[in-house]
């Protein structure tokens, strides 16, 4: 990472960003073509899970090259400067990772992967039918590397700051 001052090295902080993210963006490549797609996801601390329909473009890219790059972000906030157009920016925390995609094929694995996704969004495990598992393709990204970035430190508000009039 070029800006080491923005790098997040703590795995605990990186995991926290992943758990706070709403969307995972997957980047695929084949031949001389790239494909980026947002997906809902689950995370178990070592792998990311996502699902697809039985057919589609993602599957074509996975078949050609099962290596992926992925991105997640959390705590995104626009910081506007009403006097200087060149001083608008975003505060954010993000994670970029690389890994290898494999398909979960048994109903037990697929239900486990789908529950990782549901747990991410709902905080609980669900009863997922064998029929749902049979008609859904579920995938696991075995994470090989992760890097985190924080755009800037969010200012800490002290009691003295809070007492000052605007």
Which stretches of residues belong to each language-model region?
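A short, structured loop/turn motif at beta-sheet edges
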Residues: 62-64, 104-108, 163
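Charged, gly/pro-rich active-site loop segments
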Residues: 2-5, 75-155
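Short beta-strand segments
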Residues: 21-54
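A short mixed-secondary-structure module that forms the rim of ligand-binding clefts
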Residues: 42-78
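Short Pro/Gly-enriched beta-strand edge/turn motifs at strand-loop
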Residues: 20-24, 121-124
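Short, low-complexity, charge-dense intrinsically disordered segments
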Residues: 156-166
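Extreme N-terminal tail/first-helix region
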Residues: 1-19
């Amino acid at each position: 990472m070029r800006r080491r001052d923005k790098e997040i090295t703590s795995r605990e902080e990186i995991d926290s960003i992943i758990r706070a993210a709403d969307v995972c963006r997957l980047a695929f490549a084949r031949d001389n073509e790239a494909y980026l797609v947002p997906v809902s996801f689950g995370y178990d601390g070592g792998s990311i899970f996502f699902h697809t329909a039985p057919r589609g473009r993602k599957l074509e890219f996975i078949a050609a090259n099962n290596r992926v790059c992925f991105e997640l972000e959390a705590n995104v906030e626009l910081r506007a400067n009403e006097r200087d157009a060149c001083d608008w920016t975003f505060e954010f925390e993000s994670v970029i990772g690389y890994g290898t995609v494999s398909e979960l094929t048994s109903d037990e694995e697929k239900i486990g992967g789908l529950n990782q996704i549901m747990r991410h969004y709902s905080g609980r495990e669900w009863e997922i039918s064998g029929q749902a598992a049979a008609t859904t393709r579920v995938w696991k990204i075995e994470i090989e590397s992760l890097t985190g970035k924080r755009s800037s430190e969010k200012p800490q508000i002290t009691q003295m700051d809070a007492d000052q009039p605007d």
